[in-house]
A protein has these predicted regions:
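Second-shell loop/turn segments in exported
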Residues: 55-64, 85-91, 118-119, 150-152, ...
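Catalytic metal-binding/acid-base residues of hydrolase active sites
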Residues: 37, 95, 182, 224-227
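Structured beta-strand-rich core segments of catalytic domains in phosphoester-bond hydrolases
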Residues: 94-182
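Extracytoplasmic/secreted cell-surface and envelope-processing proteins
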Residues: 41, 98-101, 125-128, 185-188, ...
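Metal-dependent phosphoester-hydrolase catalytic domains
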Residues: 22-23, 204, 208-218, 226-343
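Metal-dependent phosphoester/phosphodiester hydrolase catalytic core
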Residues: 47, 169-200, 204
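N-terminal, active-site-proximal structural segment of metallo-dependent hydrolase catalytic domains
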Residues: 19-109, 113, 117-129, 306-314, ...
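Bacterial Sec-dependent N-terminal signal peptides
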Residues: 1-26
Length: 343
């Protein structure tokens, strides 16, 4: 089975992916964002509500399922990244540093020698964001957790934003924000103010960076629990659709066109949408040394299953309701290929 998967993956990239010579580029730098959906370990954290994913819990979570979940995540990363693996991988819904240690040392990923940036956040369920990086492709300079404190209700806890800064092989500095905005639990409109506020905090951070250098290279990615056309992203963050001429100090959302064509990374009530997004500063669209053109959804067939209720396909999840079905996630990965040139 594993041998067949490797052969299929090889054929996919040979047939579907453009070669560097065709693009006249010297190298590619792939960035991936993936909500892996409930990647929990099996250790009880007394500070969080993780009982659902513990041995003896309501889902019957155990060590075997934990290791299988790890293998499934590894399979997705390897398939998307081909022989070199993505240079940067943003992950949502990771419970602990232990999960990251196991994942980066798993046989399917160990050869890529990933390191990770991660902080424990105050999320009630204990799920965090993290960034995996290959040290030879991304030299880490700084990392920090950007805490969120809602002024109207300080008792509400949510996930931190993860900010990481580093250098890519061209010598360019790259600022990366990994995000998982508050959920739509209780209703999209009723919870919108939380996402709007988190987006405003993020906007303050990016404005500060662009204020120091209006040609700063910024990548913002993750699961925003909102669509590109929603107020949190369009107004509070100020991320626009891609329209030339590009301004170096403006943020642009790659997922506008994907969302408006009724495609996306997540399916809800029969409709696809782009909750998972990659947003970049304008300089990354015009730079001559490190630049990108578009984002894509990785919708390989093995990540999908038949949607029996609404027809078509849907993401192949670990659980369908309470039924364990050995899938992957309720989200599909999104990614961008950056191209690098020496001048």
């Amino acid at each position: 089975m594993n041998r067949l998967f490797c052969i299929i993956t090889f054929i996919y990239f040979i047939v579907c992916e453009p070669t560097f010579s065709q693009q006249n580029q010297t190298a590619s730098f792939k960035i991936m964002s993936y909500n892996v959906e409930n990647y929990f370990d099996v250790v009880d954290d007394s500070l969080t509500n993780d009982s659902e994913y513990l041995p003896g819990g309501m889902r019957g979570w155990n060590y075997e399922k934990y290791i299988f979940k790890q293998a499934q995540i590894s399979k997705v990363i390897a398939a998307l990244g081909a022989w070199e693996g993505p240079a940067l991988i943003g992950l949502c819904e990771v419970e602990s540093e232990k999960c990251l240690k196991y994942l980066t040392n798993y046989a399917g990923l160990k050869s890529f020698k990933y390191k990770y940036a991660h902080f424990e956040s105050p999320d009630a369920r204990g799920i965090d964001v993290a960034l995996l990086y290959q040290p030879l492709a991304f030299k880490l300079i700084h990392k920090e957790a950007v805490s969120i404190h809602f002024p109207d209700n300080p008792t509400i806890k949510t996930r931190d934003l993860l900010y990481v800064m580093g250098k890519v092989p061209t010598g360019d500095t790259l600022h990366v924000f990994m995000c998982h905005f508050p959920s739509r639990l209780g209703g999209a409109l009723e919870s919108a103010h939380k996402r709007n506020y988190v987006a405003s905090v993020l906007h303050t951070k990016t404005d500060s960076i662009l204020g120091r250098n209006n040609k700063a290279n910024i990548v913002i990615m993750g699961d925003f629990n909102d669509y590109p056309t929603d107020a949190s992203l369009q107004k509070a963050l100020g991320a626009k659709r891609l329209e030339k001429p590009y301004a170096s100090n403006q943020l642009y959302n790659f997922m506008y066109s994907i969302h408006e064509s009724n495609k996306g990374s997540h399916k809800h009530d029969g409709s696809w949408g782009a909750l998972d997004q990659i947003i970049v500063s304008g300089n990354l669209l015009t730079s001559k040394t490190f630049y990108c053109h578009e984002a894509k959804v990785f919708d390989a067939e093995f990540l999908l299953e038949n949607d029996l209720k609404f027809l078509g396909k849907q993401p192949f999840r670990t659980y369908n309701g309470m039924k364990y079905q050995k899938g992957f996630s309720d989200h599909l990965p999104v990614y961008v290929d950056f191209f690098m040139k020496d001048l």
